[in-house]
Amino acid sequence: MPRYKLVVEYDGSGFAGWQRQAADRTVQQALEEAIARFAGAPVRVHCAGRTDAGVHATHQVVHLDLDRDWRTDTVRDASNAHLRPEPVAVVSAERVRPDFDARHSALRRHYRYRILNRRSPPALGRAYLWHVPWSLDAHAMHAAAQTLLGRHDFSAFRAAECQANSPVRTLDQLDVARIGDEILVATSARSFLHHQVRGMVGTLMLAGCGRLDAAGVRAVLDSRDRTRCGPLAPAAGLTLTGVDYPEPGP
C-alpha cells in the first residue's frame, strides 16, 4: 500500500484535541473521515504530535496508507474538499517510503506560544493567544528560559496524566522575545511531555512579572515537583509550527 505524508493545519479551538475519542470531535476524526470519503475505504492517520484540546497547528505532519496509488495533488485537494467546513486543511501531500513514520521518524518538533501583554483585552484573535494584562519583562523571561535548556527531568512541568515512560527530555531551544504588545515563546525538542510547554510558559510568566528570577525557575525544574510549577498557560496560545525529519536517502 502506498504511504503518504501530509502537512496539516488546523484551528484547535473547537476540537477535543488531536486523538480520536468516543464522544468528542477531534482533528484526527475529521481528517480520517474526509480522506475515507474520497478514498472509498476507512483510513487511519498517524501524527507527529498529539495536540491537546484548544491547541493549534500550522505544520502538523501525518502519515497514512491508501489502498491505491493516488496523485499527491488529488490527495491534498480531495481531502480539503471533504474537510469543509471544518477548520482543518491539508497544506501538502507527498509519497514517502513505507518505513516513514510521522511520529517515530521525527528529529525535532517546534512550538510557538503567543502572549498578548497589554492592559486592554484583544478584540480579535483571542482564540490564538494568552492575554496577560500586567507588565511582563521579556528579557527576564528569556534569561530564565535558558536555565531549562539541555537534558533534564522535566517532572515539574509534566501533567499528572502524562503517559510517557520517562520524564527526561532534551530541550534544544526556549527563546522569549517581545514584538510590540506580544511576547513570543519559541521552543524545540525531539519530544515534549504532556503539558510541558504550557507549564514552562506559565512558569516563565512568573519570571516576567518578578515573582521568580532565573535561579528560581531552575529551582522549579530541579524540584521535580509539579506543585512548584507556575500556572498552566492556556491552550489557546500554543501552536505546533514545524516538525523536522532526516533528509531522504538516495
Swiss-Prot record:
- Residues holding substrate: 111
GO molecular function terms listed in the Swiss-Prot or TrEMBL record: RNA binding; tRNA pseudouridine(38-40) synthase activity
Enzyme category, top tier: isomerase
For the keyword tRNA processing, the answer is yes
State the reactions this protein catalyses: uridine(38/39/40) in tRNA = pseudouridine(38/39/40) in tRNA
Alphabetized Pfam families for the sequence: PseudoU_synth_1 (PF01416)
Task: Please name the GO terms of the biological process aspect recorded for this protein, alphabetically.
Answer: tRNA pseudouridine synthesis
> Could you tell me the keywords of this UniProt record?
Isomerase, tRNA processing
EC number(s) of the enzyme?
Answer: 5.4.99.12
Can the keyword Isomerase be found in this entry's annotation? yes
Q: Which domain of life is it from?
A: Bacteria
Per the Swiss-Prot or TrEMBL record, the active site comprises 52 (nucleophile)
Identify its protein family. Belongs to the tRNA pseudouridine synthase TruA family.
Q: Which PANTHER family match?
A: PSEUDOURIDYLATE SYNTHASE (PTHR11142), TRNA PSEUDOURIDINE SYNTHASE-LIKE 1 (PTHR11142:SF0)
- Cited function: Formation of pseudouridine at positions 38, 39 and 40 in the anticodon stem and loop of transfer RNAs.
The protein depicted here goes by the name tRNA pseudouridine synthase A
Q: Which organism is it from?
A: Methylobacterium sp. (strain 4-46)
